[in-house]
Amino acid sequence: MRRMLYAQLPSRALVVVAQLGIADILAEGPADISTLAERTSTDAVALARLLRGLAVFGVFEEGAEQVYSLTPLGEALTSGHPASALPSATLVAGQFGAAWGDLLETVRTGQSPFERSRGVSLFTHMEQDEELRAVFDDSQGRGLALELDEILRAIDFSAYPTVVDVGGSDGTFLRRILSAHPDISGIVFDLPGSTSLQAERPTADPLEGRYSVATGDFFDSLPEGGDLYLLSHILHDWDDDRAVQILRTCRAAMSDDATLMVVDLIAANRGQRDERLHTAALMDLYMLSLFGGNGGQERTAAQVEVLLSKAGFRITRVDSLPSGMNVIRAVRAA
């Protein structure tokens, strides 16, 4: 129990390491504590204790004479890592971490901290805070990079000639799908402020001509003509009514032959304690802290099925992956 109570300390230590840029310094090569303290303007004794603690958790290697180096785990805190946790650390250091600290009031009121302090939801707040939105999108994209290999091994996307990535942000998922399957094409769809793919498209893009970018609101309408409509970590951001509305918008754009694919964590049923469900449990607490008691959430398989049924879908297949991620496929119900 005490280990759980004190678990926030390694988290805070990682945030400090991220704020000081220590992983990027060590990416240049091993360094002793005096060098690290000088380059980060910190106290050498305090910094050594911080790094020593994280070395026990496998983030750093501590060598002779307090020389530190990165482990493969620690490399995930470097800015250049494809699945870098730096954007997530930035969120925890700022408004998201503050929301965690306000969890008691969230549980008492059911309201999110953003509703209480600003009178708007998190997503409405991010429309007004471009810097926060950019860090959030970056964090989402880097986190997705951790899942893509597993998903692409498990799912044959070649069966879907045109993929519509709904709420696809910078197109990370779609680009990986297209790279793995050269005979298909796709559309990235998101709010105008969220879709940075058009602006960031590489000058010599090997996927040129195989995808397009469409903007709009997935509560209103979506591009028609897709064979697969992909919702990756979208439904868990919304309450039940809004989630059903997103699904109905997908259904309206889909033909009878099209497939809906929902990629999300699945929460534990009553009494389940499978270790694979720990990630979903942590993420649901995360969602509670940000969205309040009646907002975004991780759902059980039965709850997801209810949402799909309300929106006019019938589940055809569920793939439960080793990481705890689930890929749910559905079609329009008769």
UniProtKB/Swiss-Prot annotation:
Coiled coil: none annotated. GO terms for molecular function: O-methyltransferase activity; protein dimerization activity. It comes from the Bacteria. InterPro entries: COMT-like, O_MeTrfase_dom, Plant_O-MeTrfase_dimerisation, SAM-dependent_MTases_sf, WH-like_DNA-bd_sf, WH_DNA-bd_sf. It catalyses: 5-hydroxy-3-methyl-L-tyrosine + S-adenosyl-L-methionine = 5-hydroxy-3-methyl-O-methyl-L-tyrosine + S-adenosyl-L-homocysteine + H(+). The active site is at H236 (proton acceptor). Pathway: Antibiotic biosynthesis. S-adenosyl-L-methionine binds at D190, G216, D217, F218. Its EC number is 2.1.1.-. This is O-methyltransferase SfmM3. The lineage of its organism: Bacteria, Bacillati, Actinomycetota, Actinomycetes, Kitasatosporales.
